Amino acid sequence: GGHPLEDLVLVGVAGLVVLAVRRALRPDVRLPSAAAPQRPVMIWNAKSGGGKAVTHDLPAQARRRGIEPVELTEGTDLRALLEQLVDEGADGLAAAGGDGTQAVVAAVAAEHDLPFACIPAGTRNHFALDLGVDRDDVVGALDAFVDGGERVVDLAEVNGTVFVNNCSLGLYAEAVQRDEYRGAKLRTILATATEAFGPSDAVTLDYRWTGPDGSIEQGATVILVSNDVYRLGGGVGAGTRPRLDAGVLGVAVLRSPDTASTGAPVPLWSAWSVTEFEVDADEPAHDGSVHVGVDGEAMTMTSPLRFTTRPGAL
């Protein structure tokens, strides 16, 4: 092997290259100036991200900037709370919590044509990453309502429920219904699928959808529908979206090897973009209900699932 010092230098150079590429991939958008809201509020969750809002003293930091902090407590109807705040005169809505919270606050902001600020106080903060918000500067994100610029981005929805990142069906959606897998990454769940759920055919549910060529397809382990298109694969930048204003849904379908090996050749993984997408699903319960993971939150919806994009809604 090489000299330890040479190895250290190579590792250091490799790390700098990766960092440089990541910075190059980070959205760098020069934003037009926007008038600051006069009565902004910040919804914050003390438990999100291991307590980031508390660690960074976000309520006090918000008050210093003229932003009213409103704590989201367990059992609170977030949408009803937001509607009440808007009725009372709130003219800007910020969300300091996970992506599920971001989606609800963003939806209400869009409905009332109010400015929205994403505060990266969740665990992964995927929406913040793709917006170009510095996830390491939690407090600095509050300045969006002080001297920030305006950026218009898309939202997406499934059966009337808004999402900012993605909606998952199949194995991942089944997993997030379970406490032990909540918050786990998709690749972790896939790696332990057989152990957790049994044979692969037990998690290949009867989904039917229209493929990119217009044909009806069925049989999938995972269907992922996203607000705009993710970079896929294992390279640097994978799992991020270069644009949030393309006005499309990204669709990615993963099949089990058993499904793909029967009949005509079928790729294990396929991806494309559309503006509308529909999935018919027969769950084992046969009651028309479908387990869905919406921005990481476990939900149950009624089939068929109708996905649409809302270009420039936020």
Walk through the language-model features, giving the residues of each.
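ATP/nucleoside-binding phosphotransfer catalytic cores, i.e., glycine-rich phosphate-binding loops
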Residues: 1-22, 212, 243-246, 253-314
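Active-site beta-loop-alpha substructure in enzyme catalytic cores
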Residues: 220-255
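Short glycine/serine/threonine-rich phosphate/pyrophosphate-binding segments
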Residues: 100-105, 126-127
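N-terminal glycine-rich "phosphate-gripper" loop used for MgATP/nucleotide binding
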Residues: 95-99
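Alpha-helical membrane-targeting segments
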Residues: 182-201, 235-237, 250-271
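Short acidic/glycine-rich loop or secondary-structure boundary segments that cap or lie
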Residues: 172-175, 216-219, 231-235, 259-262
